[in-house]
Amino acid sequence: MKNQKIRIRLKAFDYKLIDQSAAEIVDTAKRTGAVVRGPVPLPTRIRRYDVLRSPHVNKSSRDQFEIRTHQRLMDIVDPTDKTVDALMRLDLPAGVDVEIALQ
């Protein structure tokens, strides 16, 4: 797999979980002899929702909720076959979304 790179993008609501998963991926890739760039923290997406507290009147009284989506990006440069196999067998927590692209 010469002159290729694997781009991994992680998304999660909990920043501790995403940092732990990123560290696990970096350790696995380095153990197999690949060069890792990252993890690079991408901007956190904040979705805010305003909900009326009362079902009838009092429009000025609202509850505010938000969901924060944390993201990390990392590149694995010149991965070996060992690296790909190790990443396939890696078990990450359920709250982390992983997108892998081969470039």
From Swiss-Prot:
PROSITE patterns: RIBOSOMAL_S10 (PS00361)
SMART domains linked to this entry: Ribosomal_S10
GO MF annotations, alphabetized: structural constituent of ribosome; tRNA binding
Transmembrane regions: none
Superkingdom to which the source organism belongs: Bacteria
Single GO cellular component term: ribonucleoprotein complex
Gene Ontology terms: biological process: translation
Keyword Ligase: no
Pfam family, one: Ribosomal_S10
Keyword list, A-Z: Ribonucleoprotein, Ribosomal protein
Main function: Involved in the binding of tRNA to the ribosomes.
Family (UniProt): Belongs to the universal ribosomal protein uS10 family.
Quaternary structure annotation from Swiss-Prot or TrEMBL: Part of the 30S ribosomal subunit.
The protein's name in its UniProt record: Small ribosomal subunit protein uS10
Species of origin: Bordetella petrii (strain ATCC BAA-461 / DSM 12804 / CCUG 43448)
